[in-house]
């Protein structure tokens, strides 16, 4: 029951995301839908800000609409304190639509004064400690310029919100006009009027708003706020850890199975214990007790035991919650609400009746004479109980197999050859050049020259963040066209990966043909290439172009940097997305403006000293910035948080399932030894050794494990085959996992039987024969 409680709390937590939002049932997020080549559909949460105004003005069903611009990090100063924080620009209507809990102040003030900002509670504590942050002044660094703001309010950002932030600023403070052409990081939300029911025609009309206002617009879909956490099937850059309805269903079934396993064991143990009460039942029947009275007696005893077990389960759940929260990375608490009360009542009545029904009706069926003789071991009863234990073996073996496959796939994901070097690679945010005048100075080069003087620094490069590139964006993809040998125009959509001249060498990319795009900055002036942009394509792009040797080909492209691109080389495929996705056709190019990340390859020795040196050199050049870094391998592993959590939960509940299954074996063996005490005594009198008697019992249960094994193997194989199909790159479901799982359960079962039967077989035969 403790396992069922923990799963129940986890499921409730997953199902109640966004519940703190007052308007959660009427808020929708706009999703852009783009038709790609081959009939593929790409969805993105990024649209354009003017859509919010259009929906407010053109659709009476829409009560309000808002947008937010999602950006990276900024540096906040308060006196001598300096921190790095994530930030967003929000529309003036943002706090009319969303209802984040207000700790202090008035977030609505940023409507009137763009020099006011809103802080998250955690950010306010970092800057001001326990003193009030409202009305205090903070200084922000934007692209080399300093801005001063006053704190309007401090908000609590619940964990169960898909919108997370540390700082919010008014969109009126943004330095560029936010118009129909501005797509980068813009999420739009609409709020319908209460009680509004939109027809299919209304939804269809609303879905074409962007198309109607701009030629380059896209079709829109509308995602209910409450559905974002569990029913987002596309990549969402604003949510780092989406839930999954499949996992909800999976663990619901798992909880039910564990409860049934516990109830089956309760039935077996109750029957074994009740078998010792035949004389009591006979006496009560002789004195006039009706069968209904006996049934009620057994059921009431079962309900009392279920009640006591649930009280203990609740206490154990409270004790285990901190450990469980560490496994699932949540902060779940056990609260007394009506859902929990209903769950407890269902547990008491359901488990009590389910577990007590069989012994109650079985024991009360005998007439007084049969009861005084010790009852009758009917074949039906023995077969049923053995069948229940066999079902538990099926569940336990299947869970061992599934857990093994999950961990094998996770190990594969974390250790697969990505086509690039991820070990001992320090990744740092790149704030070393002035964005507003990047043509004039290039601080990254200065930093590279300084840190490369340290022998523990092997190479440095600037590029885009690759730990989960794309992340739902569509702005990195461009369509290229060329004329093939037949004189026809071919085209291919490719993903652009920006880096400097040392990008390929530092990341360990393998050049297959041609050359890199070089490191001469004079030849690469963003937005002003004299002739053509040199690019290096990957293997996938080469194959999809269907050209024998594309090196030297000129491609046409209507990108922001120019109209023509020259292929100068081909690089071996490398993964710039999680291994759920296949490698997409991509091209590498030089762009100083897009170098938002530093990759620093360091020696595995003296890491602490090297990191300290990197930090000191960075802060010498940019004393107003915070040097934040992580290791590339750690960032890549974060892509598989769901798989790691799934594996950990499977491991915990597999161990519990094995324990529960072995308790079932223990109960069945206890029942068998009670019923066969005289048989054991007679066999010993006739010369049978204790080991032979133990083997006789083991052989019976080995048959049950064998039957369970042949049922569990195909079931678990089909289940894992379906799960593993979610990954473009998969481990093999190795054949040896199946006999390994069977052997684990068989070994534990035999140890349980040997301990229990060994005690009965070691009794004096005289005592055994006198027993009945």
Segments from the language model and where they lie:
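Hydrophobic alpha-helical transmembrane segments of multi-pass inner-membrane transport and secretion
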Residues: 1-12, 243-279, 384-409, 644-678, ...
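Membrane-helix entry/capping segments
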Residues: 206-255, 275-278, 290-291, 320-343, ...
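Short juxtamembrane loops and helix-capping segments at transmembrane helix boundaries
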Residues: 15-24, 160, 164-175, 231-239, ...
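Interfacial "coupling" helices/loops that link adjacent transmembrane helices in transporter permeases
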Residues: 262-303, 664-702, 756, 763-764
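Alpha-helical transmembrane segments of integral membrane proteins
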Residues: 1, 237-240, 270-307, 318-437, ...
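Mid-to-C-terminal secondary-structure elements
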Residues: 91-104, 117-246, 449-638, 642
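Small-residue-rich transmembrane alpha-helices
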Residues: 6-9, 302-366, 408, 699-761
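Membrane-proximal extracellular/periplasmic loop immediately following the first transmembrane helix
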Residues: 8-73, 177, 183-194, 202-203, ...
């Amino acid at each position: 029951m403790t396992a069922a409680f923990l799963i129940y709390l986890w499921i409730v937590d997953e199902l109640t995301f966004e519940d703190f939002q007052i308007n959660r049932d009427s808020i929708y997020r706009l999703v852009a839908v783009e038709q790609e080549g081959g009939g593929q559909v790409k969805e993105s949460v990024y649209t354009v800000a003017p859509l919010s105004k259009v929906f407010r003005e053109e659709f009476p069903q829409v009560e309000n609409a808002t947008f937010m611009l999602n950006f990276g990090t900024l540096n906040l100063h308060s006196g001598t304190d300096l921190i790095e924080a994530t930030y967003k620009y929000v529309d003036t209507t943002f706090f009319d639509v969303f209802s984040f809990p207000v700790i202090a102040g008035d977030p609505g003030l940023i409507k009137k004064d763009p020099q006011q900002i809103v802080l998250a509670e955690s950010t306010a504590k970092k800057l001001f400690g326990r003193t009030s942050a409202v009305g205090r002044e903070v200084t922000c660094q934007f692209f080399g310029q300093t801005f001063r703001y006053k704190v309007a309010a401090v908000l609590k950002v619940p964990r169960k919100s898909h919108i997370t932030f540390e700082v919010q600023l008014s969109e009126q403070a943004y330095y560029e006009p936010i118009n129909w052409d501005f797509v980068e990081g813009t999420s739009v939300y609409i709020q319908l009027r209460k009680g509004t029911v939109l027809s299919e025609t209304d939804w269809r009309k609303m879905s074409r708003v962007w198309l109607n206002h701009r030629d380059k617009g896209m079709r829109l879909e509308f995602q209910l706020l409450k559905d974002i956490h569990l029913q987002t099937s596309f990549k969402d850059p604003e949510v780092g850890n989406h839930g999954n309805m499949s996992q909800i269903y999976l663990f619901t079934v798992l909880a039910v199975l564990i409860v049934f396993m516990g109830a089956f064991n309760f039935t077996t143990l109750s029957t074994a214990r009740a078998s010792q009460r035949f004389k009591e039942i006979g006496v009560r029947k002789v004195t006039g007790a009706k069968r209904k009275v006996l049934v009620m007696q057994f059921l009431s005893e079962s309900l009392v035991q279920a009640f006591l077990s649930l009280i203990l389960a609740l206490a154990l759940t409270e004790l285990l919650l901190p450990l469980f929260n560490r496994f699932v990375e949540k902060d779940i608490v056990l609260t007394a609400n009506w859902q929990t009360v209903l769950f407890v009542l269902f547990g008491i009545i359901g488990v009590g009746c389910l577990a007590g029904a069989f012994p109650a009706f079985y024991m009360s069926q005998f007439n007084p004479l049969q009861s005084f003789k010790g009852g009758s071991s009917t074949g039906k009863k023995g077969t049923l109980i053995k069948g229940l234990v066999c079902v538990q073996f099926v569940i336990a073996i299947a869970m061992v197999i599934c857990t093994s496959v999950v961990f094998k796939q996770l190990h594969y994901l974390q250790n697969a050859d990505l086509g690039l070097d991820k070990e001992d690679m320090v990744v740092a945010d790149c704030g070393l050049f002035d964005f507003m005048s990047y043509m004039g100075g290039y601080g990254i080069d200065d930093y590279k020259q300084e840190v490369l003087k340290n022998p523990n620094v092997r190479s440095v490069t600037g590029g885009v963040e690759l730990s989960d590139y794309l992340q739902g964006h569509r702005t990195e993809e461009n369509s290229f066209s060329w004329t093939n040998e037949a004189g026809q125009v071919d085209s291919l959509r490719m993903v652009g990966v920006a880096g400097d001249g040392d990008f390929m060498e530092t990341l360990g990319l393998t050049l297959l043909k041609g050359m890199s795009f070089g490191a001469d900055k004079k030849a690469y002036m963003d937005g002003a290439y004299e002739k053509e942009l040199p690019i290096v394509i990957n293997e996938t792009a080469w194959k999809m172009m269907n050209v024998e040797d594309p090196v030297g080909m000129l491609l046409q492209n209507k990108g922001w940097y120019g109209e023509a691109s020259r292929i100068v080389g081909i690089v071996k495929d490398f993964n710039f997305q999680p291994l759920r996705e296949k490698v997409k056709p991509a091209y590498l190019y030089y762009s100083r403006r897009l170098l938002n990340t530093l990759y620093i390859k360091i020696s595995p020795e003296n890491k602490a000293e090297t990191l300290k040196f990197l930090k000191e050199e960075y802060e010498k050049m940019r004393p107003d910035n915070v040097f934040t870094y992580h290791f590339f391998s750690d960032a890549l592993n974060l892509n598989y948080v769901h798989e790691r959590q799934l594996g950990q939960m499977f491991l915990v509940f597999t161990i519990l399932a094995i324990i529960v299954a072995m308790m079932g074996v223990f109960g069945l063996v206890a029942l068998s030894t009670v019923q066969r005490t005289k048989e054991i005594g007679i066999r010993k009198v006739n010369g049978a050794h204790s080991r032979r008697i133990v083997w006789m019992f083991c052989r019976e249960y080995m048959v049950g494990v064998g039957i369970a094994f042949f049922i569990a193997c195909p079931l678990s194989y089909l289940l894992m085959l379906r799960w593993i199909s979610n990954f473009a790159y998969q481990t093999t479901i190795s054949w040896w996992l199946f006999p390994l799982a069977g052997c684990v359960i068989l070994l534990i079962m035999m140890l349980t039987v040997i301990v229990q039967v060994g005690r009965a077989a070691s009794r004096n035969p005289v005592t055994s024969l006198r027993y009945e």
